[in-house]
Amino acid sequence: MADLTQILHALILGFVEGFTEFLPISSTGHLILAGQLLGFNGEKAKVFMIAIQLAAILAVVWEYRVRLRHVVSTVHTEPASRRLVVNLMAGFLPAAVLGFLFYKEIKGYLFNPIVVASALVIGGVLILWAERRKHVVSTPTVDDLGWRRALAVGFAQALAMVPGTSRSGATIIGGLFLGLSRKAAAEFSFLLAIPTMFAATAYDLYKNWQLFDAGDIPLFAIGGVASFASALFAVRTLIKFVSRHDYTVFAWYRIVFGGVVLATAYSGLVDWGVTH
């Protein structure tokens, strides 16, 4: 049975996953750093991360349930539905292939706080650069997106296999570079998350199924509920936010947060579990 400390950790990490999964600030990076600070790492933490990520995906499915139901029921009759399915397949492909080929290397060498912090800073600088460019909109809605640009967004998404990069950040900023409107870039990022994250979660489950323990189910449920609720809030909030604002605030957050982690790591003020 989970004790109070474990329950608190589950709630904190669930909220961290949900809030950060669909913001351009890297959920994986935040989970690695939060887990290190809380001392919640190791095999149980690895399985727990899979569970709360699944809950975050389900929040997007719930938010877009009407649209997804319509696409599934009309994919054989409506060109717009077929186009969205093709675009999602094109966007999913790069990360699927590269993730399968380099799964062991990514999990073994890149999942550490210094990589995360460095990627946060670099990603923040790239977002600032993207926001200072003149943004010409050639694709105002997701329905206007073609498969070639969807594939290009998919290659941007593949960069997010480096923890700290941010899947949503890479796809949204990639979409802006390719001429998508802010809302279209955010919506396509959310929709692309569904096949991408389901596949990644399923593959993680396949690789780590032996680590599951029935006794941990209550803890997973607590974290999952927190992740689902906060992810739903984050998705709805970001869609409203991007219709009126740019991503500069997220860029500065990444730079400051990543800089603090690097400074505390190399000064020895915080033990991030790495040697230097």
Swiss-Prot record:
Gene Ontology, cellular component aspect: plasma membrane
Subcellular location: Cell inner membrane
Protein's GO biological process: cell wall organization; peptidoglycan biosynthetic process; regulation of cell shape; response to antibiotic
E.C. no: 3.6.1.27
Known catalytic reactions: di-trans,octa-cis-undecaprenyl diphosphate + H2O = di-trans,octa-cis-undecaprenyl phosphate + phosphate + H(+)
Source organism, top-level taxon: Bacteria
Molecular function via GO: undecaprenyl-diphosphatase activity
Membrane topology: Multi-pass membrane protein
Protein name, as recorded: Undecaprenyl-diphosphatase
Protein's organism: Thiobacillus denitrificans (strain ATCC 25259 / T1)
